[in-house]
A protein has these predicted regions:
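Residue-level signal for inorganic ion chemistry
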Residues: 34, 70, 92, 115, ...
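ALDH superfamily catalytic-core signature
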Residues: 233-378, 441, 488-492
Length: 492
């Protein structure tokens, strides 16, 4: 199983695999058992400089590649991902800890589809021509912004790489991509598979700690745009770096999303949606439905049945096909989650199920936590306001529409949310009333290409997964044409 992973990975700069300039490396660890999976190069300032120079050199030719040719390349990338989907899914599972059923059925297919989607978008890009008066013509065109720095998180490394790479390549930008040092392997393996597909220097992948190699990207004077997915705390640093250089940044950050259930909801779908909202990827999802609001008429029944379902969830080794929930990313994340569980107890919330590590059935060496429910939570509790980033959900009762809208909006975040009801008018009222960038109706965690995704408030700036995303990697130029043959007359 482990033989799908290379024993070591270097940096990918200018179409070549090169070691760190000072020989630095770090280990990639399997979160399910603590075993070392591979050794990766740790990028230095010199390495980032080399990557930027390669991207700069590649940009003039790449930006002038025809939309048809860029489309062909994006489609070829999608084909390669699909051809090697099983290998990539297993690498992602081993490196990240998420169940193989998720990487096979969600992460890898969705990544391929994002390249196909933006292959279509690149051929539909157009400008605008306007006649301003009888002798003036205005042309509006969109040009690639240049060299971009992209930093992606550990929770969806392969899919987030697709979210970032596909629109930037479609726009004609060249890229320095940095995956998380915790989960670099699937992205590095992708670059091995793509050798010869992209011109040298168009995509450069550097690896290492965010505080080191990531900071070098933020500070580099020749990077013309930043794109980041991760915590709100680090997002602030990214935004400050962009402001300092007066360059644009797109940020997809944290969340504390509201999953709202009315008493007329479809019961089986609602139960499934409550689980999917918080247990998918072990709850390590920025838009996780970590605050569940339940109308009082069904509250007790809802809590009891959801607890039964949580207790039946198969927590296990992520590479086994019957595992429903895998390992948290590392020991530090486990300690953070457990500390919030203790906070919830101290705040007076009722612990209904879970609340501890799983150490049985051969899981004692990994980072496994039982699915956890807190009931009778109030919205001012820390567990209801702060992002836990794990399989811990708070359940709060409500009676009226305006009450639950106010409670849902009582948060500094605004990334995701959902409403479950058979009343479409009510669904639309709730969806419009909740201050969030994505509101699902009778579903959760659907993140397809073609639907814009991004946050309100402290959950981010800009949108992903939509044709408008490509515009984030472009700048607008106006060509102003005077058709008159008469001088202005101002200086006669």
């Amino acid at each position: 199983m482990k033989n799908v992973i290379r024993p070591s990975y270097n940096l990918y700069i200018n179409g070549r695999w090169v070691p760190s300039s000072d020989g630095s490396t770090f280990k990639s660890i399997n979160p399910a058992n603590g075993e070392v999976l591979s050794i990766c190069a740790e990028a230095t300032q010199d390495d980032v400089n080399a990557a930027v120079r390669a991207a700069q050199a590649a940009f003039p030719a790449w930006k002038n590649v025809s939309p048809r040719k860029r489309q062909d390349i994006l489609l070829k990338i999608a084909d390669i991902i699909e051809k090697h989907a099983d290998t990539l899914a297993l690498i992602e599972t081993l490196d990240n800890g998420k169940p193989i059923r998720e990487t096979k059925n969600v992460d890898i297919p969705a990544a391929a589809d994002h390249f196909r989607y933006f292959a279509g978008v690149v051929r539909s890009e157009d400008g605008r021509a306007s006649t301003l008066d009888d002798h003036t013509l205005s042309l509006v065109i969109h040009e690639p912004i240049g060299v971009v720095g992209q930093i992606i998180p550990w929770n969806f490394p392969f899919l987030m790489a697709a979210w970032k790479l596909a629109p930037a390549l479609a726009a004609g930008c060249t890229i320095i991509l940095k995956p998380s040092s915790t989960t670099s392997l699937s992205v590095l393996e992708l670059m091995h598979l793509l050798e010869g597909v992209l011109p040298d220097g168009v995509v450069n992948v550097i690896t290492g700690k965010g505080s080191r190699s990531g900071q070098y990207i933020l500070d580099h004077p020749d990077i013309q745009k930043l794109a980041f997915t991760g915590s709100t705390e680090i997002g602030r640093d990214v935004y400050k770096a962009a402001q300092e250089k007066l360059i644009p940044a797109t940020l997809e950050l944290g969340g504390k999303s509201a999953n709202i259930f009315f008493d007329d909801c479809d019961w089986d779908m609602a139960m499934d949606g409550a689980q999917l909202g918080i247990l998918f990827n072990q709850g390590q999802v920025c838009c996780a439905g970590s605050r569940i609001f339940v109308q009082k008429g069904i509250y007790d029944k809802f809590v009891a049945e959801l607890a039964e379902r949580f207790n039946r969830v198969k927590v296990g080794l992520p590479w086994l096909e019957d595992t429903q929930m895998g390992a948290q990313i590392d020991g530090r994340q486990v300690e953070k989650i457990l500390s919030y569980i203790e906070i919830g107890k101290q705040e007076g919330a009722r612990l209904v199920c879970g609340g501890e590590k799983v150490t049985t059935d051969g899981l004692d060496k990994g980072n496994f936590i039982k699915p956890t429910i807190f009931a009778d939570v109030t919205n001012d509790m820390r567990i209801a306001q702060e992002e836990i980033f794990g399989p811990v959900v708070c359940i709060l009762p409500f009676e009226r529409e305006n009450e639950v809208i106010a409670m849902a909006n009582d948060s500094e975040y605004g990334l995701g949310g959902a409403v479950w009801t058979r009343d479409i008018n009510r669904a639309l009222r709730i969806a419009k009333g909740v201050e969030t960038g994505r509101m699902w109706v009778n579903t959760y965690n659907a993140l397809p290409a073609g639907a814009p995704f991004g946050g309100y408030k402290l959950s981010g700036i800009g949108r992903e997964t939509d044709k408008t995303t490509m515009r984030h990697y472009m700048q607008t130029k106006n060509i102003f044409i005077n058709l008159s043959e008469k001088p202005s007359g101002l200086y006669e």
